[in-house]
A protein has these predicted regions:
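Short, internal strand/loop/helix patches
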Residues: 90, 102-139
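Alpha/beta-hydrolase fold active-site loops
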Residues: 57-58, 87, 131
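Conserved redox-active cysteine motifs that mediate thiol-disulfide chemistry
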Residues: 62-79
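A short beta-strand-turn-helix
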Residues: 37-58, 81
Length: 164
């Protein structure tokens, strides 16, 4: 009987810890606040500073070359960035090697800037898994976030929250 109680107690504690962690990831601390400062450097050497994009809605996508779901959503983001010139799309390459980033860029071309993070961090946004996408309004406020691969209809929903 004592062993059963210990096992049940352990299961309860693990379940509680998992739930608390995932609840925090579902509501990153940046929601409703100014987006933390973040900049990327493209393969062409240009720096894109997300905080300088105020005045235009921003879709900020954290990804990595080794992330299967990131590859899955790549075409959706590329198509949306071409269709929505009123929205700035930025890809923040995360926890990757330079060669992994370069190979990914060659295999999955897109028109929006992407590159490794050179200012700020994914942690400041509360990223707990990849891909993670943040939707920032024209005033620089993080309106929504989504963790996991975006499909076209989900992306359209979130674009509606930041586009006028």
């Amino acid at each position: 009987m004592g062993a059963v109680a210990v096992v049940l107690g352990a299961v309860l504690m693990l379940s509680l810890a998992w739930g608390l962690q995932h609840a925090a990831l579902a509501n990153p601390p940046v929601l409703g606040r100014m987006a933390p400062k973040l900049a990327i450097q493209t393969s062409g050497g240009d720096q894109v500073r997300v905080w300088e994009l105020q005045g235009k809605p921003v879709v900020l996508n954290f990804w990595a070359s080794w992330c299967g779901p990131c590859v899955e959503e790549g075409g959706v983001l590329a198509d949306a960035s071409s269709a929505h010139s009123d929205v700035a799309f930025v890809g923040a390459n995360n926890q990757d090697t330079p060669s992994g980033f370069q190979a990914f860029e060659l295999r999955h071309p897109h028109s929006y800037p992407a590159g490794p993070i050179v200012t700020g961090s994914y942690q400041a946004f509360g990223v707990g898994g990849l891909p993670a996408t943040f939707f920032i309004d024209a005033q620089g406020i993080v309106v929504a976030s989504f963790t996991g691969p975006l499909d076209a209809s989900t992306l359209d929903h979130y674009l509606g929250l930041i586009s006028s």
